[in-house]
Amino acid sequence: MTFAEFNQSIAGDPAQPPAGLRGAAVALWHDARGNWDAAHDAAQADKSKAGSWVHAYLHRKEGDAANAGYWYALAGRRMPADGVTLAAEWEQIARALVSA
């Protein structure tokens, strides 16, 4: 799936992510559709570094910097610098996941 296809799937009507989408990408899909709880559940279930990265992003989004920092560390990443928007980070993660 390309990044463009991923974005098109978000804009569509289905209540469930596209077939074949897994783990952290499912979490980002739910987040983009406004379902933080489903996104968090999917990220938490994905024990990979990618899952930890999305998990970190979600806690950053909710304003829990301490918890986000923990998950960024598990993902082997640093918390984004001040000024990096949530939208920019979401796109960075999505591009990394759907092109992987």
Roles of regions detected by a PLM:
Residues 1-49, 59-62, 66-69, 73-100:
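N-terminal alpha-helical interaction modules that lie
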Residues 53-54:
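Alpha-solenoid helical repeat scaffolds
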